[in-house]
Design a protein with these regions (language model features):
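Short alpha-helical elements
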Residues: 1-268
Length: 268
């Protein structure tokens, strides 16, 4: 029996591919045809992140009777469509920028790839991960910087090592975003505010440190209070869409997990 959530996700995937005119990769002229189509593989990936399934193995067990392939082929197929997922995310964010709310929020969160005590033995993401520190303490992994608008539309995204300069990342991902962009005290910089300011188009509102004696108007306070929404997005991504994992055994597996979790968060 096919779960209802899978059928709903299959319909969503079909609609996305049709609306945005994203073509699946063609079947090779020579060699064996695909055991799992790109649309089905993407649906399986979203099913994992939108349901309670923590691993690809559990998803495979759910559909083993309907799949004419091995578990290895299933994993390869799901990881293969990460490029299709990346294209969909890019198209969705580009579309969201055209219809976005005036107020935007930018923030970063930690994405551990393993426990800190295991960092010396971790090899899979060694070229991309690094040691960083967040409000929760030290971690070994990546940093994800995200911009969303007041209504929850995802507008920009970037993965970096934890040691990358937050202000440089802010400039890069928000260079084509306009309106009022609100950020926390980690982005405090007079130069950043001057660089990003565009008269009648873009204004940066950065919350000052508690030790900084700066007056704040009532409407600025209300904008600052809205930052909890992007914090909730990070929480939902990690708790309910499986953004953080240490299970993949390849770089492609890690990146596919992050991209599929983000698309699941947007559409599921």
């Amino acid at each position: 029996m096919i779960p209802k959530i899978y059928e709903n996700l299959r319909h969503i995937v079909t609609q996305l591919l049709s609306i945005f005119k994203v073509a699946e990769s063609e079947t090779p002229a020579i060699g064996r045809p695909k055991k799992i189509t790109d649309a089905d593989a993407l649906t399986f990936a979203l099913y994992q992140h939108a349901s309670t399934r923590a691993t690809k193995k559990s998803v495979y067990e759910d559909f083993k009777e309907n799949l004419a392939c091995s578990y290895k082929t299933f994993v390869v197929s799901v990881n293969r469509v990460s490029m299709l997922t990346l294209r969909l995310l890019a198209i969705i964010m580009r579309f969201n920028k055209q219809t976005s709310h005036l107020v935007k929020y930018t923030d970063a969160t930690d994405i551990p790839v393993c426990l800190k005590k295991n960092m010396d033995e971790h090899k899979t993401m060694r070229s991309m991960a690094g040691l960083g520190r967040s409000t929760k303490g030290w971690f070994y992994g990546l940093k994800m910087t995200l911009t969303r608008d007041h209504d929850g539309r995802m507008l920009a995204l970037k993965f970096t090592k934890p040691g990358e300069n937050d202000r440089d990342i802010f400039r890069e991902i928000n260079k084509d975003i306009y309106g009022i962009i609100v950020a926390d005290a980690g982005y405090v910089s007079k130069q950043l505010e001057q660089d990003m300011y565009l008269e009648h188009k873009r204004w940066i509102l950065i919350r000052p440190f508690k030790t900084m004696k700066r007056l704040m108007t009532k409407w600025q306070e209300q904008l600052y209070k809205g930052r909890f929404k992007i914090e909730f997005d990070f929480r939902d991504l990690k708790l309910f869409h499986g953004l953080v994992t240490s299970l993949p055994r390849s770089v492609n597996g890690y990146l596919a997990n992050y991209l599929h979790a983000l698309l699941s968060f947007i559409v599921a």
